[in-house]
UniProtKB/Swiss-Prot annotation:
PANTHER family xrefs: 60S RIBOSOMAL PROTEIN L23A
Gene that this sequence comes from: rplW
Protein name: Large ribosomal subunit protein uL23
Organism for this UniProt entry: Heliobacterium modesticaldum (strain ATCC 51547 / Ice1)
Keyword rRNA-binding assigned: yes
PROSITE patterns from the UniProt entry: RIBOSOMAL_L23 (PS00050)
Similarity section: Belongs to the universal ribosomal protein uL23 family.
One Gene Ontology CC term in the entry: ribosome
Pfam families according to UniProt: Ribosomal_L23
Record lineage: Bacteria, Bacillati, Bacillota, Clostridia, Eubacteriales
Main function: One of the early assembly proteins it binds 23S rRNA. One of the proteins that surrounds the polypeptide exit tunnel on the outside of the ribosome. Forms the main docking site for trigger factor binding to the ribosome.
Subunit comment: Part of the 50S ribosomal subunit. Contacts protein L29, and trigger factor when it is bound to the ribosome.
Keyword line: Ribonucleoprotein, Ribosomal protein, RNA-binding, rRNA-binding
UniProt xrefs under InterPro entries: Nucleotide-bd_a/b_plait_sf, Ribosomal_uL23-like, Ribosomal_uL23/eL15/eS24_sf, Ribosomal_uL23_CS
BP GO annotations: translation
């Protein structure tokens, strides 16, 4: 099993994720090979909260160009984690 620090890469700070945070749902970019059980354990260990549900999605990279060179941004996996009523993650509070 992976370390919690390897599973969760960074939080997603967008207008939509801030609206979801009001509903006790927090969004993270996670390791692409991580499954829902690993994501749940990582969030519970790192933030001392109770996770009720985990939704994941794979996001394809966007095509980008740099002059004549074409490429793509990297693919990534996002997870939306629903917490128990009354629990919250402090890193989302001050944004």
């Amino acid at each position: 099993m992976r370390s919690p620090y390897d599973v969760l890469k960074k939080p997603v700070i967008t207008e939509r994720s801030m609206d979801l945070a009001q509903e006790n749902k927090y969004t993270f970019v996670v390791e692409p090979k991580a499954n829902k059980i690993e994501i749940k354990h990582a969030v519970e260990q790192l933030f001392n909260v109770k996770v009720l549900d985990v939704h994941t999605m794979n996001v394809k990279g966007k095509p980008k160009r740099m002059g004549k060179y074409a490429g793509r941004t990297a693919d990534k996996k996002k997870a939306i984690v629903t917490l128990k009523e009354g629990d919250k993650i402090e890193i989302f509070e001050g944004v």
